[in-house]
């Protein structure tokens, strides 16, 4: 009877096979190298013992890795212990293994590859797939969702294996949803696009910008913008390209205003025609009805006139019924007022184009203008709520006081009263450039209210003081707590400005005479400062206009050259032949625009073009060498001779032809 103990060395050697034979037995689980290198094995049907199915190998490796690294796998329990003195090989071959398994192994889920079912259903025994199908698909991968993001605001992604149904709140940056401002209550909440580059514009959406007519190309204001820093070491006679054109910020501002003026809104529910105006575009940033100022909800639109083709701003009072025709005739007096500090009023009429009775006021349109409430107060809209509102500089407030006093001087001199001096109704059309707006509306709406003009003019002074106090104290509602607002105002500004505001707030008191002329006399020192700033601005604009004068001269030269060169009637003219006296004008065009470098590449140098054209316009004595295209003719001429030939050739074109018809 064999004793149970450690097996002998000979038995261990006899039970262990050779490594070569063991490798041969496991060859069916090893992927053939020909499949890895060439994609197929030519000896697959000729006795190659290796595996030729890459999916089988990957599945087995995944299964083996899961068995090795799974912490929840059942513990190893040998089915039968070898007897004492017997080898494991002999005892395992003679005895029957136990078929019992552990409880953990019984509860383990069976391994099933993801693509096994698809391969078994689609593949055929006689056809072998050369292309390796991936073991995973994009649809099965979990989509990355940032923390704190509401997935209901985004539509499911389509394409790339991500099926989904578009929701009603889907975000599309290239499609503008029509916004029926005729029914403001129908406006829904704005959804946010977390992948937008501009976080503020994406969060606010339509509340930040006016509705666009789909995707638009950006304005091409960068065509002449200088690249890189300016060369401060340039000599006095040296010029840069940007010295000959408008400043970049000024050109950008003008082109943005031009783009805003030409903006349209297709597929809108606004009326196509309102009296003699068409192409209405809403200008309101807040789509909620507000009747606090006029007593009626008001809306502002941009429209084009069919009479002169110009663009105007239409202010509509919703639901207004005209009971007295004399009320609307009061606008005629406002049409005669021409002040640079007031928005000009052109017309007023009633209309039913909006399916109701509306009163329309026609005024000048100032593109990209903002109100003082939007510029300085957080109550101007959600666009300005996130910005820290600092105190308005005192010099800017004095500029506002000067301009409003100028407008009130013109209005009061005409025997009228502004009646509305509110931050939400004063337009900021430029840099610290303001204009009173919506002045004639109250004369029509409250025509039956009998108040003297002197009383209304004194009320203008009170409203004027409340406006400056509101801007200085940075509090929209100073009427509710004027003492606290004045306390903040006193700490931030000089005594002269404080005394001016106090004098305006006491405009209704009868203790002394108060009118706009007395106010202008009191702020005369600040008027001189504002007037001096206006003169400096005039000098700057004149200098910028002088730069554009250079462009006009160069355009005239280019026009003359193109009128003269390459005319078909000059093909057989001796003066334009290769030996003619005007042939050098054709070669000069190649010298300016068609130069090439040593490699034969075109030379695109704006500085060279501007230099040559300026010398041609001046007619200098500098000589240049002009070579024909076939390099057989060469001219050495001066710019003076070129200018003389250009003028004589152009005058010859203007003379009537003497050829018989």
Swiss-Prot record:
Annotated Gene Ontology cellular component terms: P-body; PAN complex
Renumbered to this chain, motif PABPC-interacting motif-2 (PAM-2) spans 63-83
Provide the organism lineage as a comma list: Eukaryota, Fungi, Dikarya, Ascomycota, Pezizomycotina
Question: Region annotation Pseudokinase domain: residue ranges?
Answer: 263-524
UniProt feature, compositional bias: Polar residues: 115-126
Q: Which comment does the entry carry about domains? A: The N-terminal zinc finger binds to poly(A) RNA.
Describe its function.
Regulatory subunit of the poly(A)-nuclease (PAN) deadenylation complex, one of two cytoplasmic mRNA deadenylases involved in mRNA turnover. PAN specifically shortens poly(A) tails of RNA and the activity is stimulated by poly(A)-binding protein pab1. PAN deadenylation is followed by rapid degradation of the shortened mRNA tails by the CCR4-NOT complex. Deadenylated mRNAs are then degraded by two alternative mechanisms, namely exosome-mediated 3'-5' exonucleolytic degradation, or deadenylation-dependent mRNA decaping and subsequent 5'-3' exonucleolytic degradation by XRN1.
Give the UniProt subcellular location, in the record's own words. Cytoplasm
Annotated segments matching region Knob domain: 564-661
One family from Pfam that matches here is Pan3_PK
Q: Where are the zinc fingers (C3H1-type)?
A: 26-55
Q: Where is the composition biased (Low complexity)?
A: 77-104
Coiled-coil segments = 525-563
Q: Which GO terms describe its molecular function?
A: ATP binding; poly(A) binding; protein kinase activity; zinc ion binding
The ranges of region (Disordered) come to 1-29, 53-131
* Name of the molecule in the record: PAN2-PAN3 deadenylation complex subunit pan3
């Amino acid at each position: 009877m064999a004793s149970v103990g450690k097996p002998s060395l000979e038995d261990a050697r006899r039970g262990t096979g050779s490594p070569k034979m063991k490798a041969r037995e496991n060859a069916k689980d090893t992927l053939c190298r020909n499949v890895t290198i060439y994609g197929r094995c030519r000896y697959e049907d000729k006795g190659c013992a290796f595996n030729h199915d890459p999916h089988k190998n990957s599945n087995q490796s995944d299964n083996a890795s899961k068995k090795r690294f799974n912490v929840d796998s059942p513990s190893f329990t040998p089915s039968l212990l070898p007897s004492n003195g017997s080898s494991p090989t002999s005892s395992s071959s003679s005895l029957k293994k136990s078929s019992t398994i552990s409880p953990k192994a019984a509860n383990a889920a069976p391994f099933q590859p993801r693509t096994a079912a698809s391969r078994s259903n689609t593949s055929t025994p006689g056809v072998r797939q050369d292309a390796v199908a991936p073991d995973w698909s994009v649809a099965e991968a979990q989509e990355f969702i940032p923390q704190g993001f509401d997935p209901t605001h985004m539509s499911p992604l389509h394409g790339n294996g991500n099926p989904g149904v578009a929701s009603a709140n889907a975000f599309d940056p290239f499609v503008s949803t029509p916004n029926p401002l005729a029914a403001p209550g129908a406006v829904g909440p704005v959804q946010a696009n977390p992948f937008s580059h501009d976080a503020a514009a994406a969060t606010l959406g339509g509340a930040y910008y006016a509705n666009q007519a789909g995707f638009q190309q950006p304005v091409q204001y960068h065509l002449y913008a200088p690249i890189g820093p300016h060369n401060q070491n340039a000599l006095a006679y040296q010029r840069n390209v940007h010295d000959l054109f408008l400043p970049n910020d000024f050109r950008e501002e003008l082109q943005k205003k031009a783009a805003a003026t030409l903006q349209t809104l297709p597929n809108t529910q606004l009326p196509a025609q309102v009296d003699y105006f068409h192409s209405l575009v809403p200008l309101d940033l807040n789509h909620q009805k507000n009747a606090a100022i006029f007593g009626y909800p008001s809306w502002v639109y941009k429209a084009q006139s069919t009479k002169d083709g110009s663009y105007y701003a239409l202010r509509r009072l919703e639901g207004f019924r005209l009971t007295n025709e004399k009320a609307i005739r009061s606008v005629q007096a406002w049409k005669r007022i021409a002040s640079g500090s007031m928005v000009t009023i052109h017309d007023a009429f009633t209309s039913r184009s909006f399916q109701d009775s509306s009163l329309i006021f026609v005024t000048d349109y100032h593109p990209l203008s903002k109100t003082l409430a939007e510029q300085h107060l957080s109550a101007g809209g959600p666009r300005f709520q996130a910005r820290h509102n600092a105190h308005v500089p005192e010099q800017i407030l004095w500029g506002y006081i000067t301009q409003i006093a100028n407008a009130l001087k013109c209005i009061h001199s005409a025997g009228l009263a502004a009646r509305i001096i509110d931050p939400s109704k004063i337009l900021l059309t430029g840099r610290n450039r303001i204009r009173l707006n919506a002045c004639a509306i109250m004369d029509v709406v409250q025509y039956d209210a009998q108040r003297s003009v002197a009383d209304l003019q004194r009320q203008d002074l009170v409203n004027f003081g409340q406006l400056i106090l509101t801007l200085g104290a940075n509090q929209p509602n100073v009427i509710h707590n004027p003492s606290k607002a004045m306390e903040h105002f006193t700490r931030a500004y000089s005594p002269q400005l404080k005394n001016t505001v106090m004098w305006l707030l006491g405009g209704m008191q009868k203790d002394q005479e108060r009118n706009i002329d007395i106010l202008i006399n009191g702020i005369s020192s600040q008027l001189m400062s504002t007037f001096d700033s206006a003169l400096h601005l005039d000098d700057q604009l004149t200098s910028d206009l002088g730069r554009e004068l250079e462009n006009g001269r160069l355009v005239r030269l280019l026009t003359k050259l193109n009128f003269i060169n390459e005319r078909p009637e000059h093909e057989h003219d001796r003066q334009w032949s290769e030996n003619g006296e005007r042939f050098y004008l054709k070669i000069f065009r190649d010298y300016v625009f068609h130069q090439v470098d040593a490699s034969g590449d075109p030379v695109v140098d704006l500085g060279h073009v501007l230099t040559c054209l300026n010398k041609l316009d001046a007619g200098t004595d500098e000589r240049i060498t002009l070579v024909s295209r076939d390099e057989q003719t060469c001219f050495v001429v001066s710019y003076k001779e070129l200018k003389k030939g250009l003028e004589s050739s152009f005058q010859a074109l203007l003379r009537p032809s003497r050829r018989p018809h």
